[in-house]
Amino acid sequence: KPNIITIYYILLILLHYFRGDNALLSRIYDIFLRKGFKVLDVRKLLKKNIANDKNNNYKKFKNKITLEQITYYFNIAKENGSLDKGQSVIVDNNHILLREDRKGTDNLIFRYKLLNRSDSFSLLVKICKPNQNIYFDLPTIGPKTIKNIFLSGIKGIIVEKNNSLIANPEETFKLIKKYNLFYYAV
């Protein structure tokens, strides 16, 4: 039987549910802090899973994309993220083709496949949204993401260095190499 405090916290969480996942998770984070819990930074717990630039393969693709384009794509993804609409965009020819919605990155990749643009050099850009609670809500990629990217015709991925998680990094980078995909951590 829930007490009045529990009901209060459930209502607080429900009120933030429709404001975006960052608002919801930040509210839950605040509740834990108020209750005296120490919330650990996921980046300290999963150091080997944090995106870095050691696997960047730009040199292999420098005839397809410039460093200036990479920076531009990163910045437009950050602008999009400031709207709390999603962590990911798909870009090509200096334009956003598709934006992530509440259905997530996998759905975004699926929607790209429907465009049938496999001949272009489209990239998935997955970043940490401005003002996102980085203690536990980091953008994440992994083997499934890489397989989906490859199957959809997307040619690679740009992630945010030090603010993105890579699930099963060894397998993820094996697949990036196997599928000849572009990878760059900004």
Over which residues does each language-model region extend?
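C-terminal binding/interaction regions
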Residues: K147-V186
